[in-house]
């Protein structure tokens, strides 16, 4: 039985109890990562219960592994780091044309627009950069509970004319955004092992 992250742990634990089969959980992040240290006791309890019942705990990074061992008091012998990986890109994606940016550079944030990903730092940094030069465009691609706040923040800083918010991206759109970028910025305040840089 394989359960991914805390929302599936109760089902995984139940399946283990009913079937008698071993449970392996996959920890992509803990509430310590998602909450900037303001851990929700309910979420922590669900995470800990899943880990306590797991026969094997796979973590996306050594950082997450240490958090699981130290903060959730798990036996290090059952906790392993299993890093995310990617497949090589298809020729179609490799052949996406790169626009000419000789007059204007593009700086991109691509990810969930949530507290954990630090989008406000991207907007603040953009405001500082744009005080020095205006030949840069900023792209904040993604969706999340902070999207409207980031749109408002860009407007309040007087930089909305240099910002583009294309929304959630998937498939080929993601590669087109990357190919159109001169710089990718990942201002995450906690990133156990992000998919975006892969």
Label each residue range with its predicted role:
Residues 3-8:
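Short His-centered aromatic/hydrophobic patch
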Residues 19-24, 32-49, 88, 92:
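Nucleotide-sugar donor phosphate/pyrophosphate-binding loop at the beta->alpha transition
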Residues 63, 85:
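Carbohydrate-associated surface elements
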Residues 100-126:
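Conserved donor-binding/catalytic core segment of Leloir-type glycosyltransferases
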Residues 149-169:
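Nucleotide-activated donor-binding/catalytic signature segment of Leloir-type glycosyltransferases, i.e.
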Residues 168-169, 176-181:
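Short alpha-helical donor nucleotide-sugar binding micro-motif in glycosyltransferases
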Residues 189:
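Aromatic "clamp/platform" in nucleotide-sugar-dependent glycosyltransferases that forms part
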